[in-house]
């Protein structure tokens, strides 16, 4: 038996359909060599190791696919989206299973949309656009058809994919590839980025899994919160990436500004987030910035309400004059 996944992976596509341990079995009538080992270097860190050609972009061989996917190395280096590598590999080296040998499984539309949302602004900045060949519109929606997404992959025993320096499966998640673009905590940045949460926290642990890093922090103070509840205790900050950006050091105390995943009630520490060594002065600044931001929001709301009221007044005055006449 030749498995098309790493570590007994299970794929959970639309509805309640669960494909049992994605393995290529030798069955009567099955075409020989329908699945082949993934040989695309960028995709060897992902949790499947069997693919099928031609892929979704009509490359007949992996050699052709390697040449084509290499154009995205620069974009991947910006860490513009934690979903970009998964999406690209699902297109260029689609997962192959015994159940779906006749047609490679496509990535879900939502995965494409998240990757595009994060990375298209960078492409536009350099006068490029999101490739038509990677259009999201034609991809299947999770609850209406079979598709693959990071959330739909679990191990057979429920464990994550451990990162092991001696394990070639995790190449590409190496920290030496990580280049974090520093983001300074300024009022302009705070207003522009509209962070969901701001906390004072001490870093307790950095957990490194294959293609995923999580920071475990002890929350000391909550300066701003949104929809996800933040307890005054140890919480996880999820990167959904093999890189920890911004970088954190264990036992250091930071002011952290980031975003949230409302659907899964997670706090995110992703590209564009801020982590600066805690200083009381900085904490006071952030509180002032937040008050200004709230005040600006209230003024905008009051102004639009006032404009609406003013637009109604002439009508009422006109009616009253007509009544007097």
From Swiss-Prot:
Keywords: Developmental protein, Differentiation, Disulfide bond, Glycoprotein, Secreted, Signal, Wnt signaling pathway
Stored PROSITE patterns: FZ (PS50038), NTR (PS50189)
Biased composition (Low complexity): 300-312
A Pfam entry, by short name: NTR
UniProt cross-references to InterPro entries, sorted A to Z: Frizzled/SFRP, Frizzled_dom, Frizzled_dom_sf, Netrin_domain, Netrin_module_non-TIMP, NTR_Sfrp3, SFRP3_CRD, TIMP-like_OB-fold
Domain observations: The FZ domain is involved in binding with Wnt ligands.
Protein name per its UniProtKB record: Secreted frizzled-related protein 3
Organism of derivation: Bos taurus (Bovine)
Gene name, Swiss-Prot/TrEMBL: FRZB
